[in-house]
Amino acid sequence: MNGRACRILQEGAAELGVEISDELVTLFSLFADELKKWNRKINLTAITGDEEIALKHFVDSLALCRLVSGDDELLDLGSGGGFPVLPLALVFPTMTAVSVDAVEKKIIFQRHAARLLGCRRFEAIHARGEDLPRMLERRFNRIVSRAFSDIPSFARMALPLLMPQGTIIAMKGRGGAEEADAARGALEEMGLTVVRVTEYRLPFSGDARTLVEIGFC
């Protein structure tokens, strides 16, 4: 990444309460370079500029740091090029992080990136979300996604994999709070409820973002 992108990463993360050391900047820069290189061959992301990657992939993913920790067992459903799961795995190296996507080439990239970045507690699985309950015996206390278009569909897929005291976290944009309100009825039918809605602005761009936390009733 260029110098401005590195500054966006560090300063943007700091606005969200996350300290990014110079060592981590080097790792994130390596991640960005690999993402761009692989993206020339396979379609991983439409976001290709250094500054955009730093802000819309890295900083955006790190907004979850306020809701997760290094002790978590985290599952990212529909992770695409590795977001938000790989940035979280870099910041929390002790976190058990599992990434799932239905597109095999994206999972192959994630495995390569994780090896390159030294993410030892990271696993990437090529699967459809609905197939996971019969593939995985384990359960997770944090299940996250920024890929799903609607909250009930995400919650329905995550529910069989959620620990009793765990939370499902949907990363949404503008209108996320209203979407959470509209989903309450469907969630209650699943035995779930909206625990908390956090609205904030993405640093530098000012774009509206919403984190919707969902737990058992």
UniProtKB/Swiss-Prot annotation:
Major place of residence: cytoplasm
Q: Which reaction does it catalyse?
A: guanosine(527) in 16S rRNA + S-adenosyl-L-methionine = N(7)-methylguanosine(527) in 16S rRNA + S-adenosyl-L-homocysteine
Give the EC number(s) under which this enzyme is classified. 2.1.1.170
PANTHER family xrefs? S-ADENOSYL-L-METHIONINE-DEPENDENT METHYLTRANSFERASES SUPERFAMILY PROTEIN
Give the originating organism: Geobacter sulfurreducens (strain ATCC 51573 / DSM 12127 / PCA)
Matches recorded under Gene3D superfamilies:
Vaccinia Virus protein VP39
- This protein is called what? Ribosomal RNA small subunit methyltransferase G
Q: Which family does it belong to?
A: Belongs to the methyltransferase superfamily. RNA methyltransferase RsmG family.
Where in the cell does this protein reside? Cytoplasm
